[in-house]
Amino acid sequence: MAYHYLMDLALILLSTKLLGLLTQRFQMPQVVGALLAGLLLGPAGLNILTETEFLSQLSELGVVVLMFSAGMGTDVQELKNSGRAGFWVALLGVIVPLLMGTGLAWGANAVGLIESNNLLEDIFIGTILTATSVSITVETLKEMGKLETKVGNTILAAALIDDVLGLVALTLVSSLAGGGDSILLVLLKIVGFFIFAGVVGYAANRLFCWMLRCQNGWATHRNSVLAFVLCLVMAYCAEKFFGVADITGAYAAGLAVACTPKGAYIQSKYNPLGYLLLTPVFFASIGINVKFDGISGGMLVFSI
């Protein structure tokens, strides 16, 4: 049993690639195939695989590496230029699902599809629908070759800002319900994170440039290791101390590395790791975690 995880990984890697190729034939991203592989092998399907601590931690590392690589592949100047457009897209991406989700929840409750006791619960359901999956967005853009384009940067900026705005909205609703942190505390943490990310990212960027300049390229390989250390530390601090998703910290670390002369070289070291192992495990793990127990027909109709 100690080595059962090896067979689990083999099944995940094989199924995600096969179903990824299949979905690609139908003009869909391969990430859809990876999600379907998890559904098929998990409790919602054949029940061959179940979520384990090993798979959970490996999948979490997978999404961190995915966002770190996305940050390293981002044109920082283009991202700055796309910031305003990304903000308005993100703002609409929160407001529209929030209003429509709240209205649909109220209507679904009225006809008996779901049960909600008051308007606040309907608003909470609407708030949940504001969430986006930045990781799926990144993987799809990478597969399409659009991640480093103006459109890709706008979409990515919008997705990241949407995550932050969604967190603020969720905190506000939780505060109205009498639980969770205060909205002021959450806003201070978010501002604190961006200050932290800016200072640490700038310092790390200067350090990498100094090492390359002083050692005539000798430190290139070591910079790859230090870059990953930076990614892990920023991802941890984002989640632990600032209440921001770890993937946001990883992406910020990637942006810092992208500004160095060897940013593209360092990124090339992590792309194979993500493609061969970590990214497939992450997306398959999403499907494996899906369980239909306790989901009523009305809730299923509402979800669709």
What are these regions (language model features)?
Residues 1-41, 45, 49:
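N-terminal transmembrane signal-anchor/hairpin module of polytopic inner-membrane proteins
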Residues 9-10, 17-18, 164-265, 272-277, ...:
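Core mid-bundle transmembrane helix pairs that form the ion/substrate translocation pathway
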Residues 34-43, 89-103, 157-171, 219-236, ...:
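Small-residue-rich segments of transmembrane alpha-helices in multi-pass membrane proteins
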